[in-house]
Amino acid sequence: MLRTDRTWWLALVGLCAVLVAPLFVVDVPPLLDYPNHLARAFVLASLPDDTILARFYAPHWSIIPNLALDLLAPPLMHVLPVHVVGRLTIAAAILLPVLGTVAYNTAIGGRWWSFGVGLVAYNTCLLQGFLNFSISVGVALLLASCWLRWREARPRRAIGLAIVGAPVLFACHLMGLVCFGLLIGGGELCRVVQTPSSIVRRGLALLSVFAAPAALYSISALQPLGGDAEFLPFGDKLFQLVTIFSNYDWALDVAVAAAAMGVPALGQVFRWGRVPCPAACAMGLLAIVFLAAPYAWKGTYLLDTRFAVMLGFMLFAGFVPNRVPPIASVGMALLFAARMVLLVVVWADHRIDLTDLRRVLAPVQPGQAVYVVEAGQQENPAYWTANPHWRALSDGTRLDEHLGALALIERRAYWPFQFDMPSQQPIQTREPYRKLSGKVGHVPDWAEAAVADVCGFDYVLSLEADAFPDPPARRFRLLARSGFAALYAIDACAG
């Protein structure tokens, strides 16, 4: 038994090592929103001492259920380089859901099957840079595993830890708190079905756990925020159960999705595995909420996608096989290896774009303002069809939209697309830069930029500069061009 335990722990360490290995390949991984979040953490770490950044931004702390990165990264940036801290937070976003999945599965009697979670570790939400969400889901799974282990044997310990952990989850990301509620709610529902007389006692325990987060939400900046909910067509919603596995090769992604969903399904049919009652109830609740949830609400997008990702982790957290056919085990191991090799290759190639971008940003001085423009996917579809695979996921989601944030991080220059929603980020843009940001709105394509009012900016930074010829020379003067990127001085700011 001791030898088996040692082998299991070594395998877990090996899995974690393989999963974080890509972070040693490139210093700015191609995660869509990540450069934007890193820039905000860099600003928070630099204020109030950096007088240049203080012209652009000011801290704006309030009760916000989306603060994991903002609380973790700035203190670390006082002792470690910014890109090291950034990759540490990505490592946390990768490993916490993996460790939480393993912990949950072992709490319900599983062991080796949970290691298959490596197939969903690099899911669509992680690759789109939703780090706070990913961290919070990992913490939710870890807390839920403790709840399952201790709820009956040591109820005070289980409830006490949950009461402390729930506000922490609220601070990390609200969706993590919702995930935790559904996981332990599923466990309690299972017990109530078995012992109906315990419904009041268990209901009061859940109320005590979520009382503090409910009070925090009622006074948070998110609570009064309005906005109509947006829903995807039902077919598109269901398709998200596959697209959560999206990486860089569609055929491989579909094979991974088929294996991750197919093995537990076949295990149930042929009775070589089971989904214990607490996990089954939790997965049922997650499925119901996924079907009912909007795609967008209160300024947050991909809401239902996040529940699909939670279900993806539960495929490995909630299934306990008596045995897994060797062909399935070998097949999943090969899929994992292929997925990780492809990811490492893609991330290594991404360094080409980073080198181009840094080369053209060299003339930018601290305190200057940089207008960023990109090649729209509809503006030049042929370019995107032939585009290098590191700039978009297999489902077409582009990943380079926020690379302009490097102008802020590495050149201490202003860029107009910093996330600063009061309900989601503890930072605000100062005037006159707030007015500049409002004037630009979204990241423009070249058709928009050619006639845009760019008064107030010093430069135009072009991403995908190899997609188009130079813009009008009477307005924009080329200073530097290097493959993916180009920098232009502004000679006539009004079109």
Where are the regions that the model predicts?
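Transmembrane-helix motifs of polytopic, lipid-linked glycan transferases
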Residues: 88-108
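Membrane-interface transmembrane helices that cradle and orient dolichyl/undecaprenyl
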Residues: 143-158
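Short hydrophobic/aromatic helix or loop-helix immediately within or flanking a transmembrane segment
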Residues: 39-46, 57-82
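Transmembrane catalytic cores of multi-pass membrane glycosyltransferases
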Residues: 21-37, 48-50, 57-61, 65-66, ...
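Short periplasmic/luminal acceptor-recognition loop of GT-C membrane glycosyltransferases, typified by
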Residues: 350, 360-444, 449-465
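Hydrophobic/aromatic-rich transmembrane helices and adjacent perimembrane loops
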Residues: 298-324
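Short acidic/glycine- and proline-prone juxtamembrane loop motifs at membrane-interface regions
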Residues: 128-136
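Signature aromatic-anchored transmembrane alpha helix within multi-pass, membrane-resident enzymes
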Residues: 317, 321-345, 350
